[in-house]
């Protein structure tokens, strides 16, 4: 495909990110990318210049290790979304922009992304992807978490593993059970990434205790988090086509 096609990837990412900017609090930022616009890429082929110029040498080397197309596209799309999200963050806090190929977004020992070789700290970063979309969140707080999840019937099959009757009863529209279950899942995944990233426990440590509808397609879920320095946290939720996006943040720096 032509450079114009890949330019559409960045243009659509800009549009989607602007559309869902309300999910980010205070000085935080969010980015959302459509990975279908990268479908022409193949792991063994040379990365087009328009995309390659966004990656550092370290990231380019990391990308070369992915031989499975789906994982290749998700990793690349996630990094491109995160770098755009960081660009938005710098603009929000009135800092000079950085060339995206001058710093790396790597993963720590728990798999959580972080910025390497940049003085723009403290901040936290989270990345998620699901069925052709990637999402990123950058926050000035100690931690943050974002999750994007497609609404599918799989949620009913695994519901007992991540939720209970009390949480499901908080919703007053049982006709939307798949959506409701996906909201609970996304909320708990976002909390895990933000507050429980270094723990083996996942869903059992987070209990949804309150759900408040804030708009036609937006909600706030209040969660009790066991074993966290922030035992009570809020997850902002929005629907996006047949997807759910959930975002949360941890404590502020002292």
Where are these regions (language model features)?
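Core catalytic alpha/beta fold that binds nucleotide/phospho-ligands
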Residues: 1-254
